[in-house]
Structures are given as C-alpha cells and as structure tokens.
Amino acid sequence: RKEYVLHHDNETYYGHVSRNGIYISWDHFARGYHDYTDGVNVGLHEMAHAISYDVFLGYQDRHDRGFKRRLQEFRVEGGPVFRAMKEGDPHLLDSYAATNFDEFWAVCVETFFETPESLRDEEPGLYATICELLNQDPTRQDKIIDKRMAGIRY
C-alpha cells in the first residue's frame, strides 16, 4: 500500500511502469486525488510513463502515427524548458522533472491536469502542444478538442 522497494536497485518507489504493467502505491495514488491543484498525482504520472513506454517500446503497428508525431513534437517544444530546468532555472514544474526527459514528460502531464491554468500561462507553447497531443484542454468547458479524433459522432 505504501511506497515500496524494488529488489534490482533498492530504491524506494511510489510507482513505476515496466513491460509487465503499471505499479502504484495505493496510498500515494489516493493522495493524488485529495488535492486536485497541488500538481502531484502519481496515477497521472505513471499513466504518462505508460503512454510513452507503450508508444516507443511497445508494438509499433498498433499506434496512431499521428500520436507518435505529436509526442515527438512535445519533445521538441519541451526540450528548452527541460534544459533550463536542468541548469537550475526555477519553474512551475516540480523539480523532479529535471531528473531526465521521461520524468519531465510525466511531471508535465501531472501539471497539465492538476494546475492547467498555471501551465498555460507560464508555458503557453508547451501547454498547447500537450493539448494537441492528448486531444483535450482542461481549461475549456468542452475539454475535447477534436471530437472526430476522440471517436465521438455527431
């Protein structure tokens, strides 16, 4: 239920993704939904890892090429922000985002859903790229951007 230690590296985890599944400390998962605005949500964080893991390491033939392209666009748009954080620049994103680019992506997803207005205001290009990538804008009343892409019929 609480954080756990993996035998291969003796590190403490709240969640992780592997080819065998998504593993999450239930206590930390539940905490993520007690405060929707603190920017911390292990469930969202690990789902972001699962998305990138599956797109880049999973079965390539089952993925929408457009989605992979949009994920690459995120890498281009997010690169300068990530590099600035690595150099120690203060940022809205949790400092854990500077660990590596995979963590940067996962922290961006947490922030996108937990404090979308702040991310939109501080990093409008990054925010717009994530909106397009995930086909939603949490700041809008009608959150889905392209209903056809989401499979919604009129």
Residue map of PLM features:
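Metalloprotease/metallohydrolase-associated module, dominated by Zn2+-dependent proteases
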Residues: K2-T37, D54-Y154
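Short alpha-helix carrying the canonical HExxH Zn2+-binding catalytic motif
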Residues: D35-S52
